[in-house]
């Protein structure tokens, strides 16, 4: 019976191209599915618009180039906020440029700052609502030179940067021939994601993950769940 069950299970596995890091995944997706829809988004008026795989790669490259220009290559970069396209490309860009530190938006401001301090994050990207949590107790933040990249802000002042302006700067740099982001070679086995546990059984702990860890999970799921090009995915739980 066990042998029969194993044979039946093996027949359900689907083949998938091997990927070991996010940069490889982005490059291959943009190459293979160039004009296909990667994200469906809502604008401020509630109208649906699309982002193709090529546009996704361009946006991650622009943001990544901007982060490098800010001196964040190989640094720890936090991301906080609700599920959004900006959150997604921030996570991808940060994990390629440095080490991404995703922080739960439901945490109290003290916990957010504690994770920032413990992780030694040099920058945090997020929406205005969640960045305010840090400003409430900014004196507790150990790194006084931390960069804040606000998804919603239109202005830049001191360490407060506008996501929109930084994206535009990144795009301009790429158009001018900057290839710093493209030159990055991702080691799939290095620490690239620092994820904090909920701490329900004690103090929260930092979990060190590589991009190979995440990619192997993606491939394992694809092995048993056949995904077609026409399939759409709706995200409810926090992306990280």
What are these regions (language model features)?
Residues 1-51, 55-70, 75-76, 92, ...:
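N-lobe entry segment of adenylate-forming
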Residues 34-37, 171-196, 203, 226-232:
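Conserved pre-ATP/AMP-binding loop-to-beta segment of ANL
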Residues 45, 132-188:
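ANL superfamily adenylate-forming
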Residues 47-50, 64-107, 236:
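Conserved AMP-binding/adenylate-forming
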Residues 50-54, 185, 192-216:
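Conserved AMP-binding A3 loop
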Residues 57-65, 188, 207-228, 236:
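Conserved structural elements of the adenylate-forming
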Residues 65, 107-137, 217-234:
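Conserved ATP-dependent adenylate/AMP-binding module captured primarily in the ANL superfamily
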């Amino acid at each position: 019976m066990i042998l029969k069950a194993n044979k039946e299970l093996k027949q359900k596995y689907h083949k998938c191209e091997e990927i070991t890091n996010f940069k490889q995944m982005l490059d291959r997706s943009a190459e293979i599915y160039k004009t296909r829809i990667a994200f469906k988004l809502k604008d401020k008026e509630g109208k649906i618009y699309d982002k193709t795989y090529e546009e996704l790669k361009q946006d991650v490259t622009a943001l990544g180039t901007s982060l490098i220009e800010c001196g964040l290559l190989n640094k720890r970069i936090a991301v906080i906020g609700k599920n959004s396209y900006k959150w997604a490309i921030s996570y991808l860009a940060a994990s390629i440029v440095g080490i991404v530190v995703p922080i739960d938006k439901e945490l109290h401001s003290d916990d957010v700052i504690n994770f920032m301090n413990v992780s030694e994050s040099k920058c945090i990207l997020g929406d205005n609502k969640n960045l305010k949590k840090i400003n409430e107790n900014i004196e507790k933040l150990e790194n006084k030179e931390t960069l804040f990249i606000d998804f919603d802000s239109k202005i830049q002042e001191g360490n407060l940067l506008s996501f929109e302006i930084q994206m535009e700067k990144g795009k301009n740099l790429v158009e001018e021939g900057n290839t710093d982001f493209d030159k990055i070679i991702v080691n799939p086995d290095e620490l690239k994601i620092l994820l904090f546990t909920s701490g329900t059984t004690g103090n929260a702990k930092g979990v060190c993950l590589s991009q190979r860890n995440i990619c192997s999970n993606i491939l394992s799921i694809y092995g048993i769940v056949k995904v077609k090009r026409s399939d759409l995915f709706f995200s409810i739980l926090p992306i990280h």
